[in-house]
A protein has these predicted regions:
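Active-site glycine-centered loops adjacent to acidic/histidine catalytic or metal-binding residues
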Residues: 90, 128-129, 157-158, 245, ...
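Hydrophobic beta-strand segments
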Residues: 7-11, 36
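N-terminal active-site segment of His-dependent metallophosphoesterases
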Residues: 45-139
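Short acidic, glycine-rich surface-loop motifs adjacent to enzyme active sites
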Residues: 231-252
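Short Pro-Gly-centered beta-turn/loop motif in secreted/extracellular proteins
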Residues: 4, 25-35
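Extended active-site neighborhood of metal-dependent phosphoesterases/phosphodiesterases
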Residues: 41-49, 55-56, 135-236, 259-277, ...
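Short, acidic Ser/Thr/Gly-rich low-complexity loop/linker segments typical of extracellular
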Residues: 10-29
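A short, amphipathic beta-strand motif
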Residues: 1-2, 22, 71
Length: 328
């Protein structure tokens, strides 16, 4: 293959871009940053395995003083101008029975939607609470969202942490276990980005986890620092899709579950044309927290926690479909 230069590589804290030979050197601590991963450039296909985003991250061997992680990219035959973006929030499956409803209700519907839009490339984003604290359901969940006719990405919600542990930033000895560990093993990094068409897509966690279901909706200083660096590679004025679990500007739901430090986030996002996609509330709401920032807080795939067929606001269990054309 040919070396690809200018590809952004990160371990979740430090960043480098590949040189003319496609090489990069990153000083990292694998115990604290267990993966290294790329932000796929728009000129290349989104790497996936059986329709689930994969191959853009690699796990580091903490036992080695040096790891070599190479990534293979496939050049697109032509640039993408139009694509479809599907945001799916809160499948929140607690047990086999709920997973079965997701499999038999949500999944066929997603396949049908994808089939009706098959002239376009489709990107899917699971906005967190993929499971309900049930780490054993990650593998069957991944199986359920495979081969839907789209490239399926995920991010972390408050129910996607292993409740026995705190999040990595609050863990003194990660080798003994940490909250994100199971998620990392199943889906890769918590904060990452990729590019498609004219859009820079970011997925982030905005849950600060204390273990045993206790958490605060907020971005840690480390999260915001990662975002600042990621955005430094994106020209000002470009379109950014930011995907998070907890909303940043919800007004409807009492104590809206909003990320506490949304203003720090808005400062970083202001120079861009931003669409934020969030879940968490099981309630549909759109907000314009700043002139260039639009938030789509979407209802849940599980509705009111699989109790029936509707969300708390009465909208049916479902997901959001966005058609993107150029910068529209």
């Amino acid at each position: 293959g040919k070396p690809v230069s200018g590809v952004v590589v990160t371990d979740g804290a430090h960043f480098k871009t590949t040189d003319a030979q496609g090489n990069y050197v990153l000083n990292t601590d694998p115990a604290r940053y267990p993966m290294v991963y790329i932000s796929t450039p728009a000129a290349y296909e989104l790497p996936s395995k059986e329709g689930v985003a994969d191959g853009f991250y690699q796990y580091l061997d903490a036992g080695k003083s040096e790891n070599q992680c190479d990534f293979v990219l496939t050049k697109r035959q032509k640039p993408v101008d139009e694509f479809v973006y599907i945001a799916i929030s809160d499948p929140q499956v607690r047990n086999e029975k709920q997973l079965d409803r997701f499999r038999t209700e949500t999944v066929p519907d997603l396949k049908q939607t994808a089939d009706s839009l098959k002239n376009f490339e489709i990107v899917g984003m699971g906005l967190g609470d993929l499971v309900w604290d049930a780490m054993n359901l990650y593998a069957p969940y991944r199986q359920a969202v495979s081969n839907l006719g789209m490239t399926m990405f995920q991010l972390m919600g408050n129910h996607d942490f292993n409740l026995l542990y705190k999040s990595m930033t609050k863990t003194d000895h990660p080798a003994d276990g940490y909250g994100e560990q199971n998620y990392y093993q199943s889906f890769g990094p918590a904060n990452y980005s990729f590019n498609i068409g004219k859009v820079h897509v970011i997925a982030m966690k905005d849950i600060d986890y204390d273990g045993n279901k206790k958490y605060t909706e907020r971005f840690t200083p480390e999260d915001l620092d990662w975002l600042r660096k990621d955005l430094s590679y994106v020209p000002k004025g470009n379109i950014v899709f930011l995907n998070v679990h907890a909303p940043v500007a919800n007004n409807t739901v009492a104590a809206g579950g909003n990320a506490r430090n949304a203003n720090a986030l808005f400062q970083l996002l202001r120079p861009y044309q931003v669409h934020i996609f969030s879940g968490h509330t099981h309630f549909y709401e759109n907000q314009l927290p700043a002139p260039t920032i639009y938030e789509h807080n979407i209802g849940a795939a599980c509705g009111a926690w699989w109790a029936g067929h509707v969300n708390r606001c009465g909208a049916p269990n479902g997901y959001l479909v966005v058609q993107v054309k150029g910068d529209d």
